[in-house]
């Protein structure tokens, strides 16, 4: 990796960890936030501390924000006040230089699927500048009644267990569900019915259409020993091989990770509630207690921008500090 100037980091493809299959993996800098743009297979990252890096990407045609893993109802030592940090996330969204047009919430809205937990999130999100919110469930949102309460609130017009798609300013968005019937430590699954629907959903699209998939559990294998992956994600992604630009946004692992494979950029978001250990750094995943003064540096939101005619989507991770 080589540093070109004070705000741009350009990856050297001879020394950046791309293996013979063309994978690129990078971890975002904890506590700083980074603006990542993929152009011609080159990943460029800009420090959020430099306002000029943000201005270069202002004025794009479509801007939206991803939040994840609010876990309202959680009150353990890893974060005894998840409501306060969710409110801080909304404040961060409202302070973005370009107002997002909508939000994606990639699941674990609640901690125990209780109505009052969903109520808290709904009330807090009303204060956000973007008023439209699109949800997919996390496993904590479907603990009871096979997810019926979740679907009645957030997915009334969806298919199956809550999957759906929509179009916005030339971008096709697909919300997927990979948390049903999840076993402890097991991989997520999409299932045949949802896969068949996805194949039909994208078949009619022009191959130049940018596609954004969003689901709770990563659609790439981050760490199978902890269930951080989706067993049948390869089948889903096979339907998108001929598209020029595919972005996959996930949550679940409570930390920012990114991988580029061919035409697909994978990105996982931090939580607004609590961090989890890095893969393999602890005996098991779960809420990780850190010194109170460090907590907000490990929580955050993700801002995504797209300009028509430009395939790369700019993905910005901001901490709650």
List each language-model region with its residue ranges:
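N-terminal export leaders
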Residues: 19-42
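Extended active-site neighborhood of metal-dependent phosphoesterases/phosphodiesterases
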Residues: 48-52, 56, 114-210, 232-247, ...
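Short, well-ordered beta-to-alpha junction loops that form the rim of enzyme active sites
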Residues: 177-178, 214-219, 251-253, 318
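Surface-exposed cleft-lining segments at the edges of enzyme active sites
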Residues: 74-76, 109-110, 179-190, 220-225
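Short acidic, glycine-rich surface-loop motifs adjacent to enzyme active sites
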Residues: 206-222
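N-terminal active-site segment of His-dependent metallophosphoesterases
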Residues: 11-12, 26, 43-119
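Active-site neighborhood of phospho(di)ester-bond hydrolases with catalytic His/Asp-centered motifs
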Residues: 67-68, 103-107, 134-139, 214-215, ...
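N-terminal secretory signal peptides
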Residues: 1-19
């Amino acid at each position: 990796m080589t540093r070109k100037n004070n705000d741009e980091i350009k990856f050297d493809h001879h020394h950046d960890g791309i293996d013979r299959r063309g994978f690129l993996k990078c971890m975002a800098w904890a506590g700083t936030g980074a603006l990542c743009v993929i152009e011609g297979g080159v990943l460029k990252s800009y420090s959020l501390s430099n306002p000029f890096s943000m201005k270069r990407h202002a004025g794009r045609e479509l801007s939206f924000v991803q939040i994840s893993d609010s876990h309202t109802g959680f009150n353990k030592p890893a974060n005894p006040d998840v409501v306060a940090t969710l409110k801080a996330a909304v404040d961060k969204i409202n302070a973005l230089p370009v107002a997002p047009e909508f939000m994606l919430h990639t699941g674990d809205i609640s901690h125990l699927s209780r109505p009052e937990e969903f109520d808290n999130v709904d009330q807090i999100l009303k204060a956000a500048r973007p008023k439209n919110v699109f949800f997919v469930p996390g496993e904590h949102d479907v603990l009871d009644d096979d997810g019926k309460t979740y679907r009645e609130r957030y997915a009334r017009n969806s298919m199956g267990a809550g999957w759906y798609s929509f179009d916005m300013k030339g971008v096709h968005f697909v919300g997927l569900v990979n948390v049903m019937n999840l076993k402890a430590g097991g991989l997520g699954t999409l299932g045949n019915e949802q896969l068949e629907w996805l194949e039909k959903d994208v078949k009619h699209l022009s191959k130049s259409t940018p596609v954004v998939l969003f689901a709770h559990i990563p659609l790439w294998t981050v760490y199978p020993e902890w269930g951080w992956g989706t067993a049948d994600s390869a089948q889903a992604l096979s339907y998108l091989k001929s598209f020029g630009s595919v972005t996959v946004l996930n949550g679940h692992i409570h930390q920012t990770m990114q991988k580029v494979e061919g035409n697909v950029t994978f990105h996982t978001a931090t939580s607004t509630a609590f961090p989890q250990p890095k893969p393999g750094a602890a005996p098991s995943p779960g809420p990780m207690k850190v010194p109170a003064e460090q907590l907000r540096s490990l929580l955050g939101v993700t801002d995504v921008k797209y300009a028509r005619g430009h395939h790369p989507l700019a993905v910005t991770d901001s901490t709650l500090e």
